Amino acid sequence: MEEGLIDRLLETLWLDRRLSQNTLNGYRRDLEKIARRLSQSGRMLKDADEADLAAAVYVDGEQRSSQARALSACKRLYIWMEREGIRTDNPTRLLKPPKIDKNIPTLITEQQISRLLAAPDTDTPHGLRDKALLELMYATGLRVSEAVGLNFGNVDLDRGCITALGKGDKQRMVPMGQESAYWVERYYTEARPLLLKGRNCDALFVSQKKTGISRQLAWMIVKEYASQAGIGHISPHSLRHAFATHLVRHGLDLRVVQDMLGHADLNTTQIYTHVANVWLQGVVKEHHSRN
């Protein structure tokens, strides 16, 4: 019964909202977790009340972000159940997500980015691929899943832009800049054929297995060159943070940055204003004569 409800909800979300498979899998994990906790008290998703759900969601010792995510999944479920006539009420209506302290992204400086981008050996096919990948990710602010999911058809070198497929399969066009376009074109014409060795592959960035690179490989590439450049605590998402923060610092309108990042809500983008301000405060503290 519980699995059936979850399956029906996820099918509806996929059909109506075109949510990505990763998002749907996340909803499934959270709802199955809540269903297991309810079953320990002899209750089910279908008949749980507000108190049951509060006890299942707000578990001592669990991260608040996990609680908030589980509550969000529950709210979607009960809105759908009420709409479908499975229930006549929504027991999550008054439940509030726990307050979460915003994690300010660690800022990578432009000097560190320069060292990172200079690290790959572009005289080798793998190094040229890695150089193109790093340049593109920093130039566009792509999520790692968007970068590894690119086909060459998504890249318009003449216009200097790419078409990214973001969350919910939403497309957006992002300028890639001359430097990034140069390295992507060099990789595509010089290194990619050597990596594929005659095989056909739609993916822009390919591995020695002659298939598109995975998110895990992209993560390893970033970590490897960050280590070579003497930069710690960096991930592919750090390049996205750096892209946004550096644009805001140089005065680009926040709504333009929002569009380039593919954020649905401007509030999500505003964190980069704070990061840029923190950087500015540090510069003043270091260089002002009164500090």
Swiss-Prot record:
The transmembrane segments are none
Write out the GO MF terms: DNA binding; tyrosine-based site-specific recombinase activity
Which residues of this protein are catalytic? 143, 167, 237, 240, 263, 272 (o-(3'-phospho-dna)-tyrosine intermediate)
Instruction: List, in alphabetical order, the GO biological process terms annotated in this UniProt record.
Output: cell division; chromosome segregation; DNA recombination; DNA transposition; resolution of DNA recombination intermediates
Task: Please name the Pfam families in this protein's record.
Answer: Phage_int_SAM_1 (PF02899), Phage_integrase (PF00589)
Q: Which UniProt keywords apply?
A: Cell cycle, Cell division, Chromosome partition, Cytoplasm, DNA integration, DNA recombination, DNA-binding
Domain Core-binding (CB), chain residue ranges per copy? 1-82
Q: What is this protein called?
A: Tyrosine recombinase XerD
